[in-house]
A protein has these predicted regions:
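Short, motif-level signal for alpha-helix interfacial/capping segments enriched in acidic residues
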Residues: 16-19
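Charged, compositionally biased N-terminal leader segments and the immediate start
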Residues: 1-12
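Heme-based O2/NO sensor domains and their adjacent alpha-helical segments
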Residues: 1-2, 22-129
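Short terminal or interdomain "cap/linker" segment that borders an active site or interface and mediates
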Residues: 1-3, 132-168
Length: 168
């Protein structure tokens, strides 16, 4: 949090964003899933090993968790339970835990480079949704900045399983 310059003000603006985003999660996910679907390198993480096509059931299961992740990010406590869950999310992107939660037959791991790279499309496309409910431009900017910090912090934590012991 210190390295990210993540402050109590950021937490306050994330909390403010929850009421704005709560009824927009489906629309947000439509944008994010559209981006993933149009990017072969990303959609490959959801392909069925037998058919080579994106696994619709797997995508739907992940979508439910992704909707909850939006709300959880806006309402996170940043305590030990939160930290432990971030590490679990990281493990679920890597072998051997990827595919276990959803019993999917897909690639064994999400390539490391996509974790932090996805911070940009996720947070950039979120900004218009933050502006939809009449928040002041200054509040939208502060909510957006808080989201950028939080998402990057989370993706850094998710990268833990990819990094050599002692190098994280």
């Amino acid at each position: 949090k210190k390295t990210m310059i993540f402050t109590d003000e950021d937490v306050r603006y994330l909390r403010m964003s929850k009421a704005i985003l709560a009824d927009q999660t489906d629309a947000i996910l439509d944008v994010w899933y559209g981006f993933v679907a149009s990017t072969p390198e990303l959609v490959a993480s959801f392909k069925n090993n037998k058919t080579g096509a994106p696994d619709a059931a797997y995508l739907a299961a992940v979508r439910k968790r992704f909707a909850q992740w939006i709300l959880d990010t806006a309402d996170a406590n940043y305590d030990q339970a939160w930290l432990d869950y971030q590490y679990e999310i990281g493990r679920r992107h890597t072998n051997p835990k990827k595919n276990q939660t959803d019993k999917a037959d897909s690639v064994p791991s999400v390539n490391f480079r996509y974790l932090s790279a996805l911070t940009i499309p996720v947070t950039t496309t979120l900004k218009p949704f933050l502006a939809k409910k009449g928040a002041s431009p200054a509040d939208v900017e502060k909510m957006h900045a808080a989201w950028v910090k939080s998402v990057l912090m989370q993706t850094i934590l998710w990268s833990y399983p990819y990094v050599r012991e002692g190098q994280f």
